[in-house]
Amino acid sequence: MPISMTRRQMLMNTGAVAAGLTLGRATARAEWIASSTLPLDEEKVKVRARLHNNENPFGPSEKARRAMTDAFNEGCRYPGGQNKKLEELIAKKEGLPADQVILGAGSGEILRMAAMAYGPQGGELLTAHPTYEGLESAARTIGAFVHRVPLNKNFEHDLDAMDRRTTQAVRLVFVCNPNNPTGTIVPGDRLRTFCKEVSKRSIVLVDEAYHDYVDAPQYSSMIDLAREGHNVIISRTFSKIHGMAGLRVGYGFARSDIVARLRQFRNQINVLGLAAATASYQDPEFQGLSRKRNAEARSYLYKVLDELRYRYIPSHANFVFFHLGKDAQAQAFRDAMEKRGILVGRVFQPYTEWARVSTGTMDEMKIFATALREVTSQGLTAAKKQAEPEN
C-alpha cells in the first residue's frame, strides 16, 4: 500500500530526489517538453486560429464574468470561504459529503497532487501511452518510475494489459477517459470492473476532463466508485465545457482520507477563479450551449476531413485525432499550419503521422479548413481514404 509523506517532507526531499534522477527519466522528461506547445513570438506569427490546447473559445459565461467583477473587492483576501462554498455546491449536486471533494488550480493540479502523494521515494505509477502527460510529467520530476502501456489497435486503453502490469509495487494507475489525444472512451461497465479490481492493489485515478462532452450511451462516470469508498480518484476541470482554461480551477472526488492526503500538496486558487467557477457550475444553459457549439464544430471538421479523404478517429471530446498519411510527419504539418497562423496540437509519440486539432469557433474551423485544403494540395501531407478503427 502507498507510503505516507507530508508536504514539508516532500519539499525537503525534492532536491535530493531530483539530483538522483536517472538519464532515462531525464530523457523522457525532455521528450515531453520538446513535444509540448511552447510559447510563440506572436510578433512574428500572427495567430488566426488557436486549435492546439483543446480550449472552449465561448467561455467564460456571462454569469461567470459578472461573478468575477463582483469578486474584485475580495482580491485583497486569501480564499477560504469561497473554497468551502464551491466544494459544498459540487458535493450536493454529485451526492457525496463535502470532505470527498477537492479543488485544485485546474485538474492538472489534482494530477500533480496525486503524483506528489503517491510517487516519491521510488514510487511506481502506470499510465496508457499516449495519453495526457500531466501526471507523468509531475511524477518524473520527483523521481517516480512511470510504466507506459501502449493503446490497443483501436486507439483505446488496453485495460487487460494495464491490469497485468499493475503489480503491488505500482502505487497509482492513471486512466484518461475520454482519452487525450485520441478522443476514445472506455465503456463504463468495462472501466468500472477494471477500477474495482485494480483498486485492490493500487489507487486508480480517472481523469474525466472531457466528461461533459460525452453523449455516448456506453459511457459513464466513475464517481460512484468514489462514493462507495474504493481506492479511486476522479478529476474534472472548469477549463473545458465551462471555458475557463485561463482561470485554473479544477476539482476531484475521492474517499475522505485520500482527499486529506492530497490536500497536503494543494496550492490556493485565486478568488476570481472561484467566483467564476461557482457561477458557471450553476449555469446549465451555458454548458448546454458549449456542448452544442462543440458538436457543430466537430461535425464540420468531420466533413472537411471526409472531403479530403483523411482517416480520423470519431471523438468524444472537443478535438479530433486524424491520420496525415503514410510517411507524413506531424511536426512538418504543425510547422506548415503555423506559417498560416493556425496552431494545432503537439506531436504525440509514437503516432508521428497523426495530428490533433481542437474544435474552435466556426470562423476558426473555416480558416483551418482553407489551410488544410491548401496544405493537402501542395503535397505536404498524404491524404488517405477515411477508415474508422476496427470494432
Annotate each language-model stretch with its function.
Residues 231-313:
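PLP-dependent aminotransferase class I/II
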Residues 75, 85-124, 142:
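Phosphate-binding glycine-rich loop
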Residues 336-340, 348-391:
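PLP-dependent enzyme catalytic core of the Aspartate aminotransferase-like
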